[in-house]
């Protein structure tokens, strides 16, 4: 067992805050319409250029263990914001740093950290309620485009394309982003389906940055029962390996030896595979698997028809242009199903909807209908170079996530204005003691920081602008950092999704509270010894075979 380094009190927190500063300083430069790019070296290929806060945060690892602990805590605020709301990662980082730094100063001055935390929690809850009250639902294409434009750093084309995609497949529809083979940026609607089942093991992941399994031109095996032993499947697996194409397995469950064997072969490179549970339950599960079979021109392997896995040929497998499997969802894009068969299936479901008297059954049938007939909108992002395409694709993905958040919880005035004006409502909060009051004061000051940072990235004095804005009672009155003018932010179309602003604050406060209430830090002691394992060399022979 490795020896441990133990630090206590303000010394431990100060070193953690040094790590927080390193990460926050790298991330904060990306905030706002005039935020700068960050260039990140990659282990292979061209460097990555990004203005996405969470991408910058994820790339940072510090040598000093204690400083790194602080940086990793701050990174978790950005990552959580990205997972829940899809955006607001830089705002979360800036807020968390401000809250943690001010909180630590007060703890060092003798304030009780638990009461500071209670005061901060009271303030954050009050601001969250204020955000909910201020939010405005969005309905029009123009408003959807505005959110997409702001979240993609002022790129109007991205905002307009996202609005168009939502118009094509509906606000709840499936929209994916992929790289185009040319310079253009287009929206294409293809046959596709998404269902809420993710991979059964993270070892199926092919893109570790996004934690998804991406299968190009895969075969799709649909099996009605549980898979616990792969022995009956050997002939079909061998045929798939010979074809050099990936395989998606959809079954009631894949467990035990079967799952372990698939994982081993995936890791050894013998078979590019992903396994997911079938969507739905009982009879509904069987119906949904039949929908997938029709969509992909495959067969549902079911014992009701006397079918056995050992007798299945590759002709019984469905196919699609692409499948993406995340932790929670599976998206099948452009299945090979016959258009006439899909239309017949749609008509069959429509007649079932007309006949059913159960509201629940009707709702579930309508979900199936939407999955079969809605299609998937694909945003195809092009550019002059690979670096440019990847950078723009990142911005499109951010903007899409932010737009979904806006549709879900509405929008508020952007540019840090909502947080700034919400801070003014906190002076009326009732508390039990001066330490809790100090916790509220920490939040009031921290809420000014995102707006200050946006202004400073635009080359102006943030403190002066904040002072001028606080003289006004209008909650929508703010500073347009793009045109350097004081405007009504809502009328100017400078809006943020309420969910993004709310999540950024809650995640930042959560991390800051952990830091100020930490008294002891235990990390592995740095070792001077070199790694005992020699570096792996390229071209490991004999790794491509199957191992069943």
Swiss-Prot record:
Coiled coil: none annotated. The keyword Chaperone applies. CDD domains: GroEL. It is an enzyme of class 5 (isomerase). It comes from the Bacteria. InterPro entries: Chaperonin_Cpn60_CS, Cpn60/GroEL, Cpn60/GroEL/TCP-1, GroEL-like_apical_dom_sf, GROEL-like_equatorial_sf, TCP-1-like_intermed_sf. One of its GO terms (cellular component) is cytoplasm. It catalyses: ATP + H2O + a folded polypeptide = ADP + phosphate + an unfolded polypeptide. Keywords: ATP-binding, Chaperone, Cytoplasm, Isomerase, Nucleotide-binding. Its EC number is 5.6.1.7. It is found in: Cytoplasm. The keyword Translocase does not apply. ATP binds at residues 30-33, 51, 87-91, 415, 496. Residues 527-548 are annotated as: Disordered. Residues 538-548 have a biased composition (Gly residues). GO terms for biological process: protein refolding. Pfam families: Cpn60_TCP1 (PF00118). Its main location: cytoplasm. Together with its co-chaperonin GroES, plays an essential role in assisting protein folding. The GroEL-GroES system forms a nano-cage that allows encapsulation of the non-native substrate proteins and provides a physical environment optimized to promote and accelerate protein folding. Forms a cylinder of 14 subunits composed of two heptameric rings stacked back-to-back. Interacts with the co-chaperonin GroES. This is Chaperonin GroEL. It comes from Rickettsia akari (strain Hartford). The gene is groEL.
């Amino acid at each position: 067992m490795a020896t441990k380094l133990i630090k206590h009190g303000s010394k431990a927190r100060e070193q953690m805050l040094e790590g927080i500063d390193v990460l926050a300083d790298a991330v904060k430069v990306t905030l706002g319409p005039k935020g700068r790019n960050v260039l990140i070296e990659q282990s292979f290929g061209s460097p990555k250029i990004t203005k996405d806060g969470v991408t910058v945060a994820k790339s940072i690892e510090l040598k000093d263990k204690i400083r790194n602990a602080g940086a990793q805590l701050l990174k978790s605020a950005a990552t959580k914001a990205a997972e829940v709301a899809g955006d607001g990662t830089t705002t979360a980082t800036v807020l968390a740093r401000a809250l943690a730094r001010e909180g630590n100063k007060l703890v060092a001055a003798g304030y009780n950290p638990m009461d500071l935390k209670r005061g901060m929690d009271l303030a954050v809850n009050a601001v969250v309620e204020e955000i909910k009250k201020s939010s405005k639902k969005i309905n029009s294409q123009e408003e959807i485009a505005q959110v997409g434009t702001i979240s993609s750093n002022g790129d109007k084309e991205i905002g307009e394309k996202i609005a168009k995609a939502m118009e094509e497949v509906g606000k709840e529809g499936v929209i994916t982003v992929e790289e185009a083979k040319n310079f253009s940026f287009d929206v294409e609607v293809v046959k596709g389906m998404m269902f809420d089942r993710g991979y059964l093991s993270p070892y199926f992941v092919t893109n570790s940055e996004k934690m998804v399994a991406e299968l190009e031109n895969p075969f799709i095996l649909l099996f009605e029962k549980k898979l616990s032993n792969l022995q009956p499947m050997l002939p079909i697996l061998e045929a798939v390996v010979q074809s050099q194409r990936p395989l998606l397995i959809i079954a009631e469950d894949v467990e035990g030896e079967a799952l372990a064997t698939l994982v081993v072969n995936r890791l050894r490179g013998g078979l590019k595979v992903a396994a997911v549970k079938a969507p739905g339950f009982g009879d509904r599960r069987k119906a949904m698997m039949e929908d997938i079979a029709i969509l992909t021109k495959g067969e549902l392997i079911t014992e009701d028809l006397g079918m056995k896995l050992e007798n299945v040929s590759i002709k019984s497998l469905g196919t699609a242009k692409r499948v993406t499997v995340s932790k929670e969802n599976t998206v099948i894009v452009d299945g090979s199903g016959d258009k006439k068969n899909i239309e017949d299936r749609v008509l069959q479901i429509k007649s079932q909807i007309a006949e059913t008297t159960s509201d629940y059954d009707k709702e579930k049938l309508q979900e199936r209908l939407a999955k079969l007939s809605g299609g998937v909108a694909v945003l195809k992002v092009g550019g002059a170079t690979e670096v440019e395409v990847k950078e723009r694709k990142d911005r499109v993905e951010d903007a899409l996530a932010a737009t979904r958040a806006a549709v879900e919880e509405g929008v508020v005035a952007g540019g840090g204005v909502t947080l700034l004006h919400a801070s003014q409502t906190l002076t009326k909060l009732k508390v039990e003691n001066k330490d809790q009051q100090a916790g509220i004061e920490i939040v009031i000051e921290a809420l000014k920081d995102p707006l200050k940072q946006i202004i400073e990235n635009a080359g102006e004095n943030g403190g002066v602008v904040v002072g001028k804005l606080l003289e006004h009672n209008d909650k929508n009155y703010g500073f347009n950092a793009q045109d350097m003018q004081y405007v009504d932010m809502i009328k100017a179309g400078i809006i943020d999704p309420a969910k993004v602003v709310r999540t950024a604050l809650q995640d930042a406060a959560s991390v800051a509270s952990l830091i100020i209430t930490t008294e002891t830090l235990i990390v592995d002691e740095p070792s001077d010894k070199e790694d005992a394992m020699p570096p792996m060399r390229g071209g490991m022979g004999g790794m491509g075979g199957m191992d069943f």
